[in-house]
Every structure is written in structure tokens, then in C-alpha cells.
Amino acid sequence: MATIEAIHTATIQVLLADGVGRLTTTRVSERAGVSVGTMYQYYPHKQALLFAIVERQLDLIVRAMLEAAERLEGCDLRTVSDGLATAWLDAKMADLVSSRAIYAIAAEFDLAELMSRAKNLMVEAISPLLRAIPDARFADPDVTAFMLAALLGGTVRVVMEAGSSEDDLERLRQELPRACLGYLKMSACPLCPSDE
């Protein structure tokens, strides 16, 4: 496990220093302090290594969102909105360096399958949560969950890819929950008198 962690850390470092185009398994193995043979034991080529890095990051985000959904079940609309935005930001900002490096990988490789799997898991986590909100109803919680995940992911990506300052990231922490709440309020159907 320590070897894999060293390889992942070295990959991120090489990515950020030199970009995807100059990343090689040899350069990563040198930076990680492992032999090329050891490197190939885990990752037979550059693409396998980069996909593993992306998958690991996506898994962390999905896990954070699943935990948030479990914790927020049955809460009111504002609490759910704020909780999901905060969980997303916490997961993405826990390792800003890795998060930014992932976007470089995404620009170079077709990650549609990995991204689709992550999107489906997010919708599966958020949709039931939206159904359980006592003070809001949604005509199609799956569509609303998809759009909320897109809002979270797209907004954070734009800010991170721009190499934003600490002030920008703090502003994102303040504004993203408001954007999510606004979207959810606009997407909610009026409650029937019997639902209020």
C-alpha cells in the first residue's frame, strides 16, 4: 500500500511540474523511489496509472457525498442544500493539488466511463435524499439530482482550473451553497396544502 501511495503522490507531482504530455512511468518511478519493474507491476502503462489516479479521486468524492446524503436524510431543503455543497467542497479541497491535477488528466484522456459511473453514483445518492426533504417536492428527483451534481462539479472545476486564490476558494465556499439552494428552490414544485 505504501508503494502505491508513493506512486500516486509522485504521479501528481510530475503532472503538476511537467504536465500530462511529459509524464512517463519512468519519471514517476524515479520520483516515487521505486523501480520501473515495480511500477509496471501495478500500472502497465501511463494510461492505467492516470486512470487509477482519477478513479481514486472520484471515489473519494462519491464516498463523501454518500456519507453526506446519509447524514442529511430527512433534513429541510436549506440544510440539505448547504450540506451537499459543503461535502462536495470539503472533498475537492481536502487535496487541492490532486484535484487540480485530475483536471489536467481529464483534458487529455477520454474519461467518459469513469465520469459516467461517478455521476450515476451521485444521482443514486442525491435523488433519494431529495425525495425525503420534508419542505420540498420535486417533479423528477433524478433529473434534479443530476443537475445539482452538474452544478456542484462544474462550478468547482471552473474555479479550480483557473488556479484560483485562497480568496476565490473562500468565496466559492460562501456562494456555492447559495447557488445550490437557489436551484433547488426553483426546481421544487409548490407544496400541496396537505403536504405543508
Regions found by a protein language model. Give the residues of each.
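N-terminal intrinsically disordered/low-complexity leader segments
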Residues: 1-2, 13, 187-196
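Basic, helix-initiating cap at the start of DNA-binding domains
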Residues: 1-18, 26-27, 31, 48
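Short hydrophobic clusters on alpha-helical segments that form packing/core surfaces
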Residues: 7-15, 57, 61, 88, ...
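Amphipathic alpha-helical segments enriched in hydrophobic/aromatic and basic residues
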Residues: 15, 24-25, 46, 50-57, ...
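Short hydrophobic/aromatic patch on the recognition helix
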Residues: 33-43
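Amphipathic alpha-helical packing segments from all-alpha helical-bundle domains
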Residues: 56-66, 79-86, 90-94, 109-134, ...
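Short linear capping/connector segments at secondary-structure termini
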Residues: 67-70, 101-109
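Hydrophobic/aromatic-rich alpha-helical bundle segments in the mid-to-C-terminal region
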Residues: 99-104, 112, 131-179, 191-192
